[in-house]
Amino acid sequence: MELIEKHRSFQGYQEVYRHSSKVTNCDMQFALYSPDNCIDIPVLYFLSGITCTEQNFIQKSGFQEFASKNQIAVVVPDTSPRGENIPDDEDYKLGCGAGFYLNATQEPWLKHYNMYDYITKELPDIIANNYKFSNSKVGIFGHSMGGGG
C-alpha cells in the first residue's frame, strides 16, 4: 500500500492510497479520513456516483469537519478499475468510472470489474489490517450510483 497524498484537515488527516488489488487485478486507489486518536472509532464507507473517483467526495463535500468532530473514519474507494489495460467504453455508463459496485459476469469486463468483492471484502480487509478502527461499528452510504451500492 502506497501513500500518495496526505493533508492535515481539521483534527485529522485526509490521505489517498494506491495498492495492488487481487480482486480487480490492477492498482486501485482509495481515500481515508482518520481523525486524531482514532482507535476503536466507527468507520463509514462512502460510494461515489458514476464518472467519479475517490477525489470527488473528499474535495467537494466538506465531510472532514463532521468526521473530525464526531470521531468517525471515512473510506472512499474509486468507482471502478482504471489503467491502460482496463476495458473501457465510449458510453459513460460503461467502463472506467462506472463499476456499479457489482461483479462483472461477461467479457471484456470479467477480469477487472469485480467491485462488489472489492467493496465488501478486499478493501475492508485492508482497512482492518492496517488501522485499529472498530470492526463492529461499520456503515456504508453513497450518492447516485453509489447510493445503490
Residue ranges and their predicted role:
Residues M1-G149:
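Non-catalytic cap/lid and distal C-terminal segments of serine-dependent acyl enzymes
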